[in-house]
């Protein structure tokens, strides 16, 4: 087991070496516009996985994958020469899905922003349901009392007691 820091440094070095070798040494016509995006090395330094992206159509991506597989031996020998380590790791090439995923996430965020704008436009024109002032206020009974209400008192003691409890003024 190697130190994780050493494995990370070796992965970075392999990434640079392979990118340089693809640019200068590999002359396969199937090789499209390739970018090595990341490299990872196992802790025992025996296997290296290189992630790459290809600018182009699906056919160009397949052609590039075949070209990388056929150039794997040349690239591995170049890594062995330029790193100077005892055992050269095997190389595995994996198409990087991050750019496509990032594009999908960006599209989803754009849709969410459009929906937020529509909701904000609806909210700006919305009016609250019910009364403009929904809070209860104390009832003022003094305005309700007039001379016509004098005949309401018919001697019913229960009603008179309720009126007295409610602080209804008597004239």
From Swiss-Prot:
<protein>
    <recommendedName>
        <fullName>Ribosome-binding factor A</fullName>
    </recommendedName>
</protein>
<comment type="function">
    <text>One of several proteins that assist in the late maturation steps of the functional core of the 30S ribosomal subunit. Associates with free 30S ribosomal subunits (but not with 30S subunits that are part of 70S ribosomes or polysomes). Required for efficient processing of 16S rRNA. May interact with the 5'-terminal helix region of 16S rRNA.</text>
</comment>
<dbReference type="InterPro" id="IPR020053">
    <property type="entry name" value="Ribosome-bd_factorA_CS"/>
</dbReference>
<feature type="compositionally biased region" description="Basic and acidic residues">
    <location>
        <begin position="133"/>
        <end position="142"/>
    </location>
</feature>
<keyword id="KW-0690">Ribosome biogenesis</keyword>
<feature type="compositionally biased region" description="Low complexity">
    <location>
        <begin position="161"/>
        <end position="171"/>
    </location>
</feature>
<dbReference type="Pfam" id="PF02033">
    <property type="entry name" value="RBFA"/>
</dbReference>
<keyword id="KW-0963">Cytoplasm</keyword>
<dbReference type="GO" id="GO:0030490">
    <property type="term" value="P:maturation of SSU-rRNA"/>
</dbReference>
<dbReference type="GO" id="GO:0005829">
    <property type="term" value="C:cytosol"/>
</dbReference>
<feature type="compositionally biased region" description="Low complexity">
    <location>
        <begin position="120"/>
        <end position="132"/>
    </location>
</feature>
<comment type="similarity">
    <text>Belongs to the RbfA family.</text>
</comment>
<feature type="region of interest" description="Disordered">
    <location>
        <begin position="120"/>
        <end position="171"/>
    </location>
</feature>
<dbReference type="InterPro" id="IPR015946">
    <property type="entry name" value="KH_dom-like_a/b"/>
</dbReference>
<dbReference type="InterPro" id="IPR000238">
    <property type="entry name" value="RbfA"/>
</dbReference>
<feature type="compositionally biased region" description="Acidic residues">
    <location>
        <begin position="143"/>
        <end position="160"/>
    </location>
</feature>
<dbReference type="InterPro" id="IPR023799">
    <property type="entry name" value="RbfA_dom_sf"/>
</dbReference>
<dbReference type="GO" id="GO:0043024">
    <property type="term" value="F:ribosomal small subunit binding"/>
</dbReference>
<comment type="subunit">
    <text>Monomer. Binds 30S ribosomal subunits, but not 50S ribosomal subunits or 70S ribosomes.</text>
</comment>
């Amino acid at each position: 087991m190697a130190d994780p820091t050493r494995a990370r440094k070796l992965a970075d070095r392999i990434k640079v070496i392979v990118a340089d070798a693809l640019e200068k040494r590999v002359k396969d016509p199937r090789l499209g516009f390739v970018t090595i995006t990341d490299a990872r090395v196992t802790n025992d330094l025996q296997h290296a996985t290189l992630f790459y992206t290809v600018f182009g159509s699906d056919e160009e991506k397949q052609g590039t994958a075949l070209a990388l597989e056929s150039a794997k031996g040349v690239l591995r020998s170049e890594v062995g020469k330029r790193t100077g380590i005892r055992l050269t790791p095997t190389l595995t090439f994996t198409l990087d899905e991050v750019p496509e995923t990032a594009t999908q996430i960006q599209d989803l965020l754009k849709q969410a922003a459009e929906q937020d704008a529509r909701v904000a436009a609806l909210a700006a024109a919305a009016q609250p349901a019910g009364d403009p002032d929904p809070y209860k206020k104390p009832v003022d009974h003094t305005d309700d009392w007039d001379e016509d209400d004098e005949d309401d008192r018919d001697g019913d003691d229960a009603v008179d007691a309720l009126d007295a409890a409610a602080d209804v003024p008597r004239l």
